Regions:
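Hydrophobic faces of well-ordered beta-strands that scaffold small-molecule active sites
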Residues: 2-8, 52-54, 79-83, 101-103, ...
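Conserved anion-binding
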Residues: 8-30, 98-169
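N-terminal beta-alpha supersecondary unit
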Residues: 18-62
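Short, acidic/polar
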Residues: 32-45, 87-92, 142-153, 201
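N-terminal active-site wall of soluble small-molecule enzyme domains
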Residues: 43-94, 177-179
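Glycine-enriched alpha-helix->loop->beta-strand junction motifs that scaffold or abut catalytic
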Residues: 48, 76-77, 93-102, 120-126, ...
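Charged helix-capping and loop-helix junction motifs
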Residues: 64-71, 141-150, 172-181
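Glycine-rich phosphate-binding active-site loops on the catalytic face of alpha/beta enzymes
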Residues: 97-113, 162-168, 193-225
């Protein structure tokens, strides 16, 4: 399953590379002539998308979130939302507007906070995103390496885990299969993102993986839903 990716900033769908948000520009996509996220999401639904990954870049950077737009999209297409959730209160707000809420290592302050959030609601409504940059765990607060994270995820056993290589986002360079293989021992369902190519999908499906986050290649018509 290809899960379309939509980054939203200042009310618009935007695109960029390698997580350098200050350089992001309005998204150009084959699905709609505008950068209106609601219209793009509806076009993705018409193209047979079953769910959509949305990163609210304003919320992640502690600016005014785009929750009205996201709530509207969620009424048309189930949203997996990354809005920088790192507290129970933020999780509750996000759960009101999205089908599932992402807790990402980028903004998570501690593993204790993660456990508190997971215990606060139905565990199935949360997805943990393991953010990776330059082959290391990307986090503003956590001091953990990949082996530490794999061990901790085995203990927590979340239903779904995203492995997102931020350094490869928007590059279409493919993903690091060696890192992915370290997580295959977990019982959690894995969703792979960051520079995904058709070759990646073909090879990763052989490992039993079947959920992929795709943005740039999808919007440029290099991959289809």
């Amino acid at each position: 399953m290809i899960i379309p990716v939509l980054d939203i900033m200042n009310g618009m769908a935007v695109s960029g590379k390698s997580g350098k948000r200050e350089t992001y520009i309005p998204l150009k996509t084959i699905f709609h002539p505008s950068s209106n996220p609601y219209k793009i999401a509806n076009a993705l639904k018409d193209a047979s998308a079953k769910r959509i990954y949305i990163a609210d870049l304003d919320a992640i950077e502690n600016r005014k979130p785009n929750y009205d737009i996201i709530k509207k999209i969620n009424q048309e297409l189930p949203v997996m939302l990354d809005s920088g959730v790192n507290t129970v209160n933020k999780a509750e707000e996000a759960l009101e507007i999205a089908e599932k809420v992402i807790i990402a290592t980028e903004t998570l302050q501690s593993i204790d906070d993660l456990i508190d959030i997971l215990d606060s609601n139905n565990k199935d409504r949360f997805i943990i995103s393991i953010d990776i940059k330059d082959n290391e765990i990307f986090s503003k607060h956590l001091d953990m390496d990949i082996e530490d994270i794999v061990k901790k995820m085995g203990e927590i056993n979340p239903p779904e885990i995203i492995l997102l290589d931020i350094s490869r986002v928007g590059t279409e360079k493919g993903v690091d299969h060696a890192i992915i293989k370290k997580f295959l021992k977990l019982d959690s369902s894995l969703i792979i993102g960051g520079g995904i190519t058709s070759k990646d999908i073909e090879e990763l499906e052989k490992l039993g993986l079947n959920k992929f986050l795709v943005g740039t290649a999808l919007h440029a018509n290099k991959l289809s839903i």
